């Protein structure tokens, strides 16, 4: 498959602190914030040429981002690749023996359907597949 990097996800403790920091660092404003209740996360997006940076703040102390930060600290959480047909790509990866963290695509931030590939099978990198809705 010819994947395009859609965004890079960065886990942060506090969006209120991190948004101004990244606006200064990147020289561009945050263009969108969104809460995704199904993932217990609040997000903020920045556009850098054709790639997005997504900041992820946990909205629940037991959520996956909170657990990630407790274990590894703030930092890069995942790389997301854009796919045209997420269901077909999930089937292709399952046939190749990859473990997916969800059996069906879920509604994610930024009007996307998403699925994650287990990082134990991708050299420790959490891979997200995403398809525009």
Model-predicted regions and their roles:
Residues 1-39, 63:
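Long, hydrophobic N-terminal alpha-helical segment
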Residues 28-48, 52, 118:
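N-terminal strand-loop-strand beta-hairpin
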Residues 36, 54-59, 64-67, 100, ...:
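Intrinsic, low-complexity N-terminal interaction/targeting segments
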Residues 1, 4-13, 44-47, 66-133:
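Vicinal oxygen chelate
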